[in-house]
Amino acid sequence: MTEDSQRNFRSVYYEKVGFRGVEEKKSLEILLKDDRLDIEKLCTFSQRFPLPSMYRALVWKVLLGILPPHHESHVQVMTYRKEQYSDVLHALKVIRFVSDATPQSEVYLYMHRLESGKLPRSPSFPLEPEDEVFLAIAKAMEEMVEDSVDCYWIMRCFVNQLNSKYRDTLPQLPKAFEQYLNLEDSRLLSHLKACCAVSTLPYELWFKKCFAGCLPESSLQRIWDKVVSGSCKILVFVAVEILLTFKIKVMALNSAEKITKFLENIPQDSSDAIVSKAIDLWHKHCGTPVHSA
C-alpha cells in the first residue's frame, strides 16, 4: 500500500469511528513545523477544516499579521506586543479612563480607540454604532482566547480586517443572502417578502457582528476560522442555514417584527449543526479549497 493510499485509508477509518480531525490535526502540525510558515497553506487549511482549539490562537495570530511567518521572531514580536498592550493600558489608567472595575471588553474598546486616535473625551460619552459592534466581538473573543494580550491583539486585528479588507464586501452580503436563500428555498424567501421582512432581518448581528451574541462561542469560532483566513462569505451561508433550520417556525410567523425578533434570539442547541451545514453549503456553492500540506 502506498503512503497516499495508507493516508486515505486512515482518513476514512478515522471518520467512521468518529475521529475525523486526527489526520487534519497531523497535517496542520506539519505546516506549523516549517521554519517559515506558509500563509497560503494555512489559509487553505483553515478554509477547509476547523482549526484544533490548541492551535487556533497561533494560526489566527499568524494569519492576522500579529506574528510574522518566521518562527524565530515569534517570541521577540510577542514581547513587543505585550509591552505595547501594557503601555496603552497604563495610559488609560493614568488618565482615569479605566479602572480595575471596568469590564474587560470595555477596556479593550478604549485601548482600541486610543490606538486609533478616536478616544472620546469621557467614558460616559454614548457609544458609537461601531463601538457596539466591537463590544459584541470583544465579549465573544474573551470566551475563545484566554490570554488577555492575545485576546486584545486578535480582536483588534479581526475588527480592522472587517473594516478594511471586507469593507466593500460586507454591504453586499444581504443581497447575496437573498440570492442563495432563493436557490435553496424560494418558498421561504417568498414568505419573507410577503411579510416585508427581507429588509428588516438582523443583518448587523449577522454580517457586522459576525454572529457574536447570536451563536455560542464554540460554534462561532468555526465560522471565524473562515473569516480570519479570507472568506467573509461564510457569513451568508450561516444566515441561510439558520433560516432553513428554523423554516417551520419562520413560516408560522406572519410579521416582519416577529420574524426578526425570533432570528435575533434563536435557540442555541442547534448551533453546531447549523454551522456544519452552513460550511457544507458554502463549499457546495463556492467550491472546496484544495489543501496541500
From Swiss-Prot:
Q: Which InterPro entries does the UniProt record give?
A: Rab-GAP-TBC_dom (IPR000195), Rab-GAP_TBC_sf (IPR035969), TBC1D7 (IPR039842), TBC1D7_dom2 (IPR043039)
The record's keywords, sorted A to Z, are: Cytoplasm, Cytoplasmic vesicle, GTPase activation, Lysosome, Membrane
User: Which branch of life, at top level?
Assistant: Eukaryota
What Gene Ontology biological process does one annotation of this record name?
Answer: negative regulation of TOR signaling
Annotated localization? Lysosome membrane; Cytoplasmic vesicle; Cytoplasm, Cytosol
Q: Which PROSITE patterns match?
A: TBC_RABGAP (PS50086)
GO molecular function terms noted in the UniProt entry: GTPase activator activity; TSC1-TSC2 complex binding
User: Oligomeric state and partners?
Assistant: Component of the TSC-TBC complex (also named Rhebulator complex), composed of 2 molecules of TSC1, 2 molecules of TSC2 and 1 molecule of TBC1D7. Interacts with TSC1 (via C-terminal half of the coiled-coil domain).
* Protein name per Swiss-Prot or TrEMBL: TBC1 domain family member 7
